[in-house]
Amino acid sequence: MAQEQTRRGGGGDDDEFTSSTSVGQERREKLTEETDDLLDEIDDVLEENAEDFVRAYVQKGGQ
């Protein structure tokens, strides 16, 4: 008996994979940018109101 190997396709194109990869990369870049903007805003608030922030933090028990 001869054995035959069958090859099955993955069902998707490489273009689909590339497209979804670039969409994921764009999303990561956007989230990174938004996170950086938020952290910058927090830094600005802390620079202006550091004493108030610490006082409120201590009143809440540091949680």
From Swiss-Prot:
PTM section of the record: Is modified by deamidation of its C-terminal glutamine to glutamate by the deamidase Dop, a prerequisite to the subsequent pupylation process.
Disulfide bonds: none
Residue numbers of Deamidated glutamine PTMs: Q63
Isoglutamyl lysine isopeptide (Gln-Lys) (interchain with K-? in acceptor proteins) crosslink site(s): Q63
Molecular function terms from GO: proteasome binding; protein tag activity
Record keywords: Coiled coil, Isopeptide bond, Ubl conjugation pathway
Coiled coil: 23-51
Biased composition (Basic and acidic residues): 1-11
Region called ARC ATPase binding, residue ranges: 20-57
BP terms from Gene Ontology: modification-dependent protein catabolic process; proteasomal protein catabolic process; protein pupylation
Disordered: annotated span: 1-36
Pfam families: Pup
InterPro entries tied to this protein: Ubiquitin-like_Pup (IPR008515)
Pathway assignment: Protein degradation; proteasomal Pup-dependent pathway
Family label: Belongs to the prokaryotic ubiquitin-like protein family.
Subunit structure and binding partners: Strongly interacts with the proteasome-associated ATPase ARC through a hydrophobic interface; the interacting region of Pup lies in its C-terminal half. There is one Pup binding site per ARC hexamer ring.
Domain remarks: The N-terminal unstructured half of Pup provides a signal required to initiate unfolding and degradation by the proteasome but is not needed for pupylation, while the C-terminal helical half of Pup interacts with ARC to target proteins to the proteasome.
Function: Protein modifier that is covalently attached to lysine residues of substrate proteins, thereby targeting them for proteasomal degradation. The tagging system is termed pupylation.
Protein name, as recorded: Prokaryotic ubiquitin-like protein Pup
Organism per entry: Mycobacterium leprae (strain TN)
